[in-house]
């Protein structure tokens, strides 16, 4: 079996549904033969490892450990789903306090045990904040830490596909930017349906303005809808898409969706948010984001919401004031 790389990939939170699915997805994609599974819950972790062994994959060196030092040492790529799970009735923001502390500890462990790691994808919520905290405490470059922010865009494509009764492949370039939550900015100007600009369809009998508003609302509540339907939070979609992200960072296929990345461009500053990017072996690089005046206003509103969350974390003492971030991580200007 051919692999994208032979370097070590560590899955943090591997005993959970997301983590275990990430591990299997990475193996089936042929990313690397060297995969380390980490989770503090040792019995569940061993169970996941046993299941993967029983799959009979060829050419794999799958290891597992509940020792974070062992898990991170020599790791070149990390995907972290090791936060507290979102439960029914909770927003991503409800998880802020608990998962902020987890992200801080993780960032410090990265700095201590694998400072030469090449790329990290953080997916535990609220990912915009946990990714930011990880970046600051790890001491890595902003291009080396990304967060899962694509599911809102994939959900937009799904909702448009269902509305028009067409294959999802016929709905192109769906994009949401800003926060990964109820305050995201859902864009219409980027998308095409059967080759036709979505903006030209909205307001017609095919898609009234009221129907478009309903679709936007469904997208912003897509994660909560999965919880209501399945009785648990999403795990298949975040597992797959996050592994697509790390695959791109390894030098695999280009990542097709927006990623959560550190933005500080004069208009939006000192924040982790969903943005148009390219992810390659050289890291995550920002592209231009353009929209209608209404969309740009929505993005500014989303940014303000993220800043409020960031400032709450600062008030909690998890992060220092923005003016002191450079002391914590010299790559943050």
Predicted regions and their residues:
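Hydrophobic Val/Ile/Leu positions in short beta-strands of Rossmann-like dinucleotide-binding domains
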Residues: 11-12, 37
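Conserved glycine-rich cofactor-binding loop
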Residues: 15
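N-terminal Rossmann-fold NAD(P) dinucleotide-binding loop
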Residues: 19-20
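Conserved N-terminal Rossmann-fold NAD(P) cofactor-binding segment
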Residues: 6, 31-76, 84, 311-318
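Rossmann-like NAD(P)-binding element
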Residues: 55-119
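Conserved S-adenosyl-L-methionine
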Residues: 28-34, 139-142
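C-terminal substrate-binding/catalytic lobe of Rossmann-fold NAD(P)-dependent dehydrogenases
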Residues: 138-143, 153-333
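Rossmann-like NAD(P)(H) cofactor-binding subdomain of soluble oxidoreductases
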Residues: 91-159
């Amino acid at each position: 079996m051919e692999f994208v790389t032979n370097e070590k990939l560590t899955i943090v939170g591997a005993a959970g549904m997301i983590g275990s699915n990430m591990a299997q997805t990475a193996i089936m994609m042929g990313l690397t033969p060297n995969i380390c599974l980490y989770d503090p819950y040792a019995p569940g972790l061993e169970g996941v490892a046993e299941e993967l062994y029983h799959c009979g994959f060829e050419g794999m060196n799958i290891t597992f450990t509940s020792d974070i030092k062992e898990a991170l040492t020599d790791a070149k790529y990390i995907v972290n789903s090791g936060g507290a799970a979102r439960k029914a009735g909770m927003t991503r923001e409800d998880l802020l306090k608990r998962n902020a502390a987890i992200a801080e500890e993780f960032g410090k462990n990265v700095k201590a045990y694998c400072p030469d790691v090449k790329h990290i994808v953080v997916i535990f919520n609220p990912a915009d904040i946990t990714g930011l905290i990880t970046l600051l405490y790890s001491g890595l470059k902003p291009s080396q830490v990304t967060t899962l922010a694509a599911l809102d865009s994939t959900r937009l494509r799904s909702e448009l596909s269902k509305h028009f009764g067409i294959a999802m492949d016929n709905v192109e370039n769906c994009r949401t930017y800003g926060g990964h939550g109820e305050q995201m900015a859902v864009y219409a100007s980027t998308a095409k349906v059967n080759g036709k600009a979505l903006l030209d369809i909205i307001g017609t009998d095919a898609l009234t303005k009221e129907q478009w508003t309903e679709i936007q609302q469904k997208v912003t509540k897509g994660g909560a809808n999965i919880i209501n339907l399945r009785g648990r939070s999403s795990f298949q979609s975040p597992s797959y898409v996050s592994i697509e992200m790390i695959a791109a960072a390894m030098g695999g296929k280009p990542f097709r969706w927006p990623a959560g990345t550190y933005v500080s461009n004069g208009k939006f500053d000192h924040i982790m948010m969903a943005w148009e990017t390219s992810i390659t072996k050289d890291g995550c690089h920002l592209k231009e984001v353009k929209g209608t005046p209404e969309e740009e206003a929505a993005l500014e509103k989303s940014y303000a919401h993220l800043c409020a969350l960031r400032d709450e974390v600062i008030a909690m003492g998890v992060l220092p004031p923005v003016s002191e971030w450079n002391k914590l991580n010299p790559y943050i200007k």
